[in-house]
Amino acid sequence: MREIKLNPDSLEIYEKSDSGKLNRNDLIDLWNLDLNDLLNISCALKKLFNKDKIDLCSIMNAKSGICPENCIFCSQSKHNTSKIDTYELKSKEEILKNAKSVEKYSNRFSIVVSGKTVTDLEFEKIIESIEEIQNKTKLKVCVSLGLLNKDKLKALKEKNVRIHNNLETSENYFKNICTSHDYNDKVKVILEAKKIGLEMCSGGIFGMGESIEDRVDLFLDLKKLGVDSVALNLLNPIYGTKIYEKIKFGVISPINSIDALKSICIARIALPDKVIRLCGGREHVLKDMQKYSLFALDGLMIGNYLTTNGQNIQSDLKMIKEMGFER
């Protein structure tokens, strides 16, 4: 990791972040700072809380497409017209095979399914897959199964897995990206999961037309909810989705690399003691600037995403090593 030298103003922000004294306006004002200053502050906070480590995770789209929800960014929604592979829940053998294929590189493996939630039968099969992975690999298991009820959350607690449920954006902006469920539906699941004692991963997507204020409000909600890991995604608009059309016709401006990096840094500063993990869209948005995001990150999703291809894993490993980090 590079040597960190903070100027007096940056040092003050660093100290306020560490002591939890940055308010909403303070975080919004960070947008006006130079990117290099934000990277320096973020890097200092990362070094304080997580040293030089980058935690790697991988996901599997274990059930794809035909989702009844109307999220405008998602190629799996039946309300969009994206051409993707659709299939029912994969077998435990297929899921285990996928997990084993990334075990050499990843610390975590997440089973992700499309839909608002899972049926009882699907849930039973997923529990079997969790047991297979835990018994036959060294991977920590995560699941992203939608809006789960208390009984299913308790069953997952018994299996010692981490739950993933993205808030996606701020409460104020959520109605612009989805109306088939609301923000509070997700909040209720997160609160119940935390009450039961589950580890929780949640986050959002940058580049859907939201403001910096919306991003800061998302970070503050994640802090208030006490999530353990924060998953940040950069919008990669997929043909056939409603948001692709909005960008095509200039209704929404696509996110650029500087915008994305600043947002990642502000997430780090707002949530200094959380695992900040960069996931989908980083290759599309950051391109050659991906390496700079590592100064603000504790985690990176590697391999393929739900319906899009990720960067070659060896390229990610090389990038991490060249930037002076460990995994």
Swiss-Prot record:
An example Gene Ontology molecular-function term: biotin synthase activity
Pfam families in the record: BATS, Radical_SAM
SUPFAM superfamilies: Radical SAM enzymes
Cofactor(s) listed: [4Fe-4S] cluster; [2Fe-2S] cluster
Enzyme Commission code(s) on record: 2.8.1.6
UniProt-annotated binding residues for [4Fe-4S] cluster: C67, C71, C74
Alphabetically ordered keywords of this record: 2Fe-2S, 4Fe-4S, Biotin biosynthesis, Iron, Iron-sulfur, Metal-binding, S-adenosyl-L-methionine, Transferase
Record text on cofactor binding: Binds 1 [4Fe-4S] cluster. The cluster is coordinated with 3 cysteines and an exchangeable S-adenosyl-L-methionine.
Residue sites binding [2Fe-2S] cluster per the record: S110, C142, C201, R277
Subunit (UniProt): Homodimer.
HAMAP family: BioB
Entry protein name: Biotin synthase
Organism: Methanococcus maripaludis (strain C6 / ATCC BAA-1332)
Organism taxonomic ancestry: Archaea, Methanobacteriati, Methanobacteriota, Methanomada group, Methanococci
